[in-house]
């Protein structure tokens, strides 16, 4: 059963501008080390970072919390399986708050935008 859905879209340039302005401080605040390693080793890092940014936003929208109740950007981690499919890994805080939620995500991007959709199901 579907318990919540969320989506988000972001301009890739917005992520690029934050990296340029704030550098590692921005990256460490929003992205886990694993996310940074994956994205920064891609041909177009900002595109992949923007996809993860949108996915994190979509996940907290699906859960209905946004980034509140002590939930931070680092509580939601977007990883890829062996086939490249993105999946969500959540912190112990989110696992406790939502009794190990099942979360599915889809990420898409083009030249200017990244978008993500998340489904929380039982």
From Swiss-Prot:
UniProt-annotated binding residues for Mg(2+):
8, 57
Q: Which domain of life is it from?
A: Bacteria
The answer to whether keyword Cytoplasm applies is: yes
Q: Which reaction does it catalyse?
A: apo-[ACP] + CoA = holo-[ACP] + adenosine 3',5'-bisphosphate + H(+)
Please state where this protein is localized. Cytoplasm
Task: Please name the Gene3D superfamilies in this protein's record.
Answer: 4'-phosphopantetheinyl transferase domain
Keyword Nucleotide-binding listed? The answer is no
Q: What is its EC number?
A: 2.7.8.7
Q: Which cysteines are joined by disulfide bonds?
A: none
InterPro entries according to UniProt: 4-PPantetheinyl_Trfase_dom (IPR008278), 4-PPantetheinyl_Trfase_dom_sf (IPR037143), ACPS (IPR002582), Ppantetheine-prot_Trfase_dom (IPR004568)
Annotated Gene Ontology cellular component terms: cytoplasm
Extract the GO molecular function terms from the UniProt entry. holo-[acyl-carrier-protein] synthase activity; magnesium ion binding
The record's keywords, sorted A to Z, are:
Cytoplasm, Fatty acid biosynthesis, Fatty acid metabolism, Lipid biosynthesis, Lipid metabolism, Magnesium, Metal-binding, Transferase
Q: What does the entry give for GO biological process?
A: fatty acid biosynthetic process
Cofactor(s) the protein needs:
Mg(2+)
Q: Which family does it belong to?
A: Belongs to the P-Pant transferase superfamily. AcpS family.
Q: What does this protein do?
A: Transfers the 4'-phosphopantetheine moiety from coenzyme A to a Ser of acyl-carrier-protein.
Q: What is this protein called?
A: Holo-[acyl-carrier-protein] synthase
